[in-house]
């Protein structure tokens, strides 16, 4: 966890960092983004498995997966970076979570 804070301190102190580089560039904040993505996917999975309140669970799942799909599509299509297998896998995971959330919502 200390590595993540050191990474944040090192990049933010005294530099004017563009937001698009922070969001889409794999070298900036890569550990932080990976940890947050894994935590979110785990959180959404646990929300759906535990069967929380229907509306709260749907809002979390819908919001997060729409943001995840939008991020992945923008990164793959509009931002000039190398296309990696992991980016495509994350897009597939987010789409699957979204579809699973919709199916779960309408079946409850």
Swiss-Prot record:
Domain of life: Bacteria
Keywords from the named record: Cell membrane, Membrane, Plasmid, Transmembrane, Transmembrane helix
Keyword Transmembrane in record: yes
GO cellular component: plasma membrane
Protein name: Uncharacterized protein BpOF4_21044
UniProt keyword Transmembrane helix, yes or no: yes
Recorded topology in the membrane: Multi-pass membrane protein
Lineage: Bacteria, Bacillati, Bacillota, Bacilli, Bacillales
Location within or outside the cell: Cell membrane
Transmembrane segments: 36-56, 58-78, 88-108
